[in-house]
Amino acid sequence: MFSQVPRTPAAGCYYLNPLTPESQEMYLRFDQTARRSPYRMSRILARHHLVTKIQQEIEAKEACDWLRAAGFPQYAQLYEDSQFPINIAAVKKDHDFLERDLVEPLCRRLNTLNKCASMRLDVNFQRKKGDDSDEEDLCISNKWTFQRTSRRWSRVDDLHTLFPVADRNGSPGGPRMRNTASSESVLTDLSEPEVCSIHSESSGGSDSRSQSGHHSADSTHALEATLVSSSLPQSTREGLNQSFHPKNEKPTRTRAKSFLKRMDTLRVKGALGRHKGPGRTGGLVISRPVLQQEPESFKTMQCVQIPNGDLQTSPPAACRKGLPCSSKSSGESSPLENSSTVSTPCMKERKCHHEANKRGGMYLEDLDVLAGTALPDTSDQNHMHGFHSQENLVVHIPKDHKPGTFPKALSIESLSPTDNSNGVNWRTGSISLGRQQGPGMREPRLMSSCHRASRVSIYDNVPSSHLYASTGDLLDLEKDGLLPQLDDILQHVNGIQEVVDDWSKNILPELQSHSTLAGDPGLSPFPSPNQVTLDFEGNSVSEGRTTPSDVERDRTSLNESEATGVRERRDSGVGASLTRPNRRLRWSSFQLSHQPQPSPATPHISSQTAAQLNLLQRFSLLRLTAIMEKYSMSNKHGWTWSVPKFMKRIKAPDYRDKAVFGVPLIVHVQRTGQPLPQSIQQALRYLRSNCLDQVGLFRKSGVKSRIHALRQMNENFPDNVSYEDQSAYDVADMVKQFFRDLPEPLFTNKLSETFLHIYQYVPKEQRLQAVQAAILLLADENREALQTLLCFLHDVVNLVDENQMTPMNLAVCLAPSLFHLNLLKKESSPKVIQKKYATGKPDQKDLNENLAAAQGLAHMITECNRLFEVPHEMVAQSRDSYLEAEIHVPSLEDLGAQLAESGATFHTYLEHLVQGLQKEAKEKFKGWVTCSSPDNTDLAFKKVGDGHPLKLWKASVEVEAPPSVVLNRVLRERHLWDEDFVQWKVVERLDKQTEIYQYVLNSMVPHPSRDFLVLRTWKTDLPKGMCTLVSLSVEYEEAQLMGGVRAVVMDSQYLIEPCGSGKSRLTHICRIDLKGHSPEWYSKGFGHLCAAEVTRIRNSFQPLVAEGPETKI
């Protein structure tokens, strides 16, 4: 880096070899008299480069993690295989079913990986292949397929379409620079996402202040390099191209270094060459500055920049947008090409427009807001060919125009007119006054642009009389030509006042909040400004949906009785109805006001299969990322869905000594199958039944001693808690403490900040959509507990006249406990805590978070019936993938057709399953992965390669009963060991040992119960005294739905083997989709539920412990 070349024989100074501008600036910061030695300076620069490289590697890892989580695992695989950079345009084509706002987050991550690949970062991600690492098996694009044997993604068609032409023809490791054969800008050859990446401020979760500058500098450097290449003569460009692909292939870093040095040399020569004199020709021309933060509306309005020189030297507008440029000259332009459109200019992002206007002129006629997006590509080319020279254009201003005011009308006359027809743009009000149409020319379309040879711009908010007074001296109205067209405009254009109001809302967004409070925003025929800027808001889930009122549902529930201590159940039809102590809460014990009431056309989260929910979570992450990166300013550059860096992976603590408080929700799921313990559900039931009329519920504090006694009762006797005669305020405070004592907030550590940002930055019109996406990303146990709590709080609000607790009052009281706002975070150092709370006053950030939490929780309480619905537009965008994720339940005829044997029936299929189970037992269940489980049970799982994300689980336990007795207990006496078993019946007996059986399992309120319809058969005459029970779901038209949601039993097998001394070994192999749960929930909790099931069967045979003293016999 440094060459020791003394300036003079006596001076020991050193020359600097050419450094990068960043390195030179860093070096020159030091004082000349006290500069570091060259060796020390090289160490500083090397350390800086190392830090930069590490930061880029972190960005690449976060981008790959996001790609896998959002349903794009194939690109993460390509990056790990060193197959980047890839063509962004091809990626966009692969995902053409996604909206533009949803593609932008993907393009940002891919541009980050392209940049990291150009730096040749050696990033090898060691991903841990855990039990729940099946995320890579889902891709939202149908252009890719997953090879399960090699566990790799492969493209359905040609893979080479993803890579740039330069990378395909040249060396695989060459720099990804493009040169063009003309003198146009390089943006002509770049796709739109690639151009947008130059202006992007986010790169996969990097820090905004430290990385955006580097990214812009690197992108500008690359642009300048290609601009130089495109403006050089052909011979010079060929010489420059030889540095890209020399005959003797050199390493990539060497070619990149030589290219950068050559670029620095050319830049210096070009800068010197411009000042050598006016006679110098053929000098190097560097492109003028490129906007690095071009606003989106600047592109939408299709503005034309007017440079100081000849217009022919600047790239046309369409070229800058990535559209193909026509080679026609101004004399060859067709009538449609000479036309243009006009509309009222948009005032959005005024500051950015002002900065852009400083760089070049802008014609008012080229501002197209409403019609620009609806016109065909030919209208975009009109702006390219409309103005070829400024000398041929004359702009007329009305005589009564006052200086300093905006002109009411403008007229542009061409000194070289052509024969074109006049026309009116019905959408924008632009009037074209040209010569009469010739006989051989066709009539122009209404939506096409008008002739530019003689054109007037008219603004919609100018009265017609005033307009004629201002333009009468400019235009020859011909009295019979224009006025009828103006009448037609007034007849055809409807709702001009609404358009003006819509523009006003766009200019002043605060006006919309007042109009929303005054009336229903859905009545407006025009979308709101936020709906215009975000495409997918146009299909809001709030449109066209009605739900039964709470009053009607409450009226229905008033006649129902609350039975305490007795379990209600309808007659099964198989045996006498049984009652026993109530340890699980039942649907019939609650009002109907808190039950979910989705409309028939609206899918609910609880009815989704695991594969469907897995797919919807990908779309939710993609949609939420698009919304938050657009509006969330504080987290715009660091958006990542990984666990925060301060949370280190530590050993999971042991919760065996805790029953209720301080236990994670997933542990409750593993114990009981429900995220909330039974004692907390009993507390909510008690408050709903007896205390909703208490004034200030959850606001008034209880007595600490009584609350402590309630906590001890819950910990010591969690299954036998009674709240009779307890104070409502004590029970309510205990419920608050339960959520406050959770190891992580109810909204999880990952997404708590996201929920707060939604209510801080996202516009009100899009908050429901953003919250729906965030709720889909919550862990299943957190989402179910949240739904139970919100439905309960909604019931509290329904009696606001008695308890005076509005949604905002409840939110203020409960938000700190649900978000853990006021708790000192463990990641904060003592110095930070001491500095933050030294004055005793919360900082502004804490105040903003508390306000956002209160507003957000109040909104969730009000919209609790809609938060857990699946948006229609998300289902529509998933296309066939959503339908393919549905589980096809076979009929009896389909079961026989699945076998290759001719004439096979469902009996043959069931016999095949029984033989397969016997074979597995004979081979000692080889290939299963064992995992830890409690209560002396053996638990293992095995992945099934049939495309469904659920695993096959196996739980084994020894039972003190012979096989035939255990089989009867499983087959006919489920009510003795399953507390959720509420209803059952035999639909049809097919033979002595085969039947179609239907039963219902209860769920936590307000979630729907699960209905099972299975075909099952059992065998008792197997070798060695074994018994089997095999069942699976079937489609049977005569069986009506008895529960809330029809679950799917893909495989359920019981194997009972004798162990001697009257004992048996019970093995249960199970694979069930309960609906409403993600694959992660099954990986974390379903295996424990299988182990708990066989444990309950074992415990049902244990003899009762006799009370009293022993007697001697």
From Swiss-Prot:
PROSITE patterns, sorted: RHOGAP, START
A Pfam family assignment: RhoGAP
CDD domains: RhoGAP_DLC1, SAM_DLC2
Keywords associated with the record: Acetylation, Cell cycle, Cytoplasm, GTPase activation, Lipid droplet, Membrane, Mitochondrion, Phosphoprotein
Compositional bias annotation for Polar residues: 179-188, 230-245, 421-435, 529-549
Gene Ontology molecular function: GTPase activator activity; lipid binding
Biased composition (Low complexity): 197-214, 322-340
InterPro entries, A to Z: Rho_GTPase_activation_prot (IPR008936), RhoGAP_dom (IPR000198), SAM (IPR001660), SAM/pointed_sf (IPR013761), START-like_dom_sf (IPR023393), START_lipid-bd_dom (IPR002913)
GO annotation, biological process: endothelial cell migration; endothelial tube lumen extension; negative regulation of cell migration involved in sprouting angiogenesis; negative regulation of sprouting angiogenesis; signal transduction
Domain SAM: 55-122
Residues bearing the modification Phosphoserine: S411
GO CC, alphabetical: lipid droplet; mitochondrial membrane
Superkingdom, taxonomy of origin: Eukaryota
Modified residues (N-acetylmethionine): M1
Site description Arginine finger, residues in chain: R699
Rho-GAP domain residues: 663-868
Quaternary structure note: Homodimer. Interacts with TAX1BP1.
Free-text function comment from the UniProt entry: May function as a GTPase-activating protein.
Name used for this protein in its record: StAR-related lipid transfer protein 13
Biological source species: Mus musculus (Mouse)
